[in-house]
Structure formats: C-alpha cells, structure tokens
C-alpha cells in the first residue's frame, strides 16, 4: 500500500550517524493531513484519497470550499491533493508522519525554484564561445539547424524561462522521523524554495 503526506520545506541541515558519518538532509514539516474525500470507481471513475494540508482562515474560503471541508469536520485547507493506492481511510481521518520510518524510500515532488528568463548556457548547459581574440561568438545559442527546412525545428534548445516546474526526485531515503515535531528528515536535497509545498509518497521504483 502507498504511503503519502503533504508537507512544507523548512530547509537543509546536516546530521551525524553513530559511526560518525556525515549526512546532508532536508527538513520537511508535515503537520497532520486530513482526508477530505474518498473517491471510488462507482462515483468518480477512479480510486483516490483527497487530503488537505495547512489550515487557512475561513474568510479566505468560499461557500463550496467550506461545505467540502465541513464533511471532514476540519478547517479550510490551503493545499488539497490526491493520493492513489491508499486504502482503509475514511473522511476525517488524519495522515501523520508516524506512517513513515527511518530507512523508507520515497519519491518527493515540489515546484522548482523559478530563475526567470535565462540564456542557453545557464538553462541548458551549453558551452560558450571564445571570450577574446576577435571572437564575435560568446554566449549566443549557436546554430539554429540546417538551411534546407527554412525554419527552426520544434524543441530547439534556446533561451527562455527557467525553473518553476513540477519536479519529482525519486528514491530518496528517510533518515529520521520526529513525530513530536511533525518533521521528516530526507537524505539529500528536494526541489522547491523554503516554505514551498512538498509531496512525499512511497517510491514507485524502489528495489523490492
């Protein structure tokens, strides 16, 4: 069965194991998520569990949103997402960090940091031209392709907006779970800025 929870990225730090090994970790705060709706094949065409995370003031919610969360007897939520392959939960149930334990392998999803409009060197890692000796080619995109088509092909790597994409990092290891603080420590880095929404769920490609 899949495990899943929504959380907020706090930042990065480091811990040491008993053997003295140094491990960089990302701190993710995941206060209890509330099950708002259980979707079934009969009513919705597919099976999923809809959960809400991070309370917000009622004045910021409209009537339909208030009615939706009232069924779960909870406050309006800032973030609402779905998890599939989670069974045995009812509306109003809570998902906490205690479902995970050290050593679990998870997939972590977030929105990468936006970098704005960037050139091909920063955006795609293209090599630059000579910077001196009369060169007139420094940081330009280079060849646009052959002459014959009389056009630039789709997907040509050019300058443009960079970052701000939905990114999933697979097979990250949970180093430690701290239930009293609703915190999960994940080995390595995860996408997104501080305070951004993070989705943690069981890895789909984990070694069995």
Swiss-Prot record:
Region (Disordered): 122-148
GO cellular component: cytosolic large ribosomal subunit
Tree of life domain: Bacteria
Pfam family, one: Ribosomal_L3
GO biological process terms, semicolon-separated: translation
PROSITE patterns membership: RIBOSOMAL_L3 (PS00474)
Disulfide partners: none
Keyword annotations from UniProtKB, A to Z: Ribonucleoprotein, Ribosomal protein, RNA-binding, rRNA-binding
GO MF term list: rRNA binding; structural constituent of ribosome
PANTHER family documented for this protein: 50S RIBOSOMAL PROTEIN L3, LARGE RIBOSOMAL SUBUNIT PROTEIN UL3C
Similarity remark: Belongs to the universal ribosomal protein uL3 family.
Described function: One of the primary rRNA binding proteins, it binds directly near the 3'-end of the 23S rRNA, where it nucleates assembly of the 50S subunit.
Subunit annotation: Part of the 50S ribosomal subunit. Forms a cluster with proteins L14 and L19.
Name used for this protein in its record: Large ribosomal subunit protein uL3
Protein's organism: Streptococcus pyogenes serotype M1
Lineage, top ranks: Bacteria, Bacillati, Bacillota, Bacilli, Lactobacillales
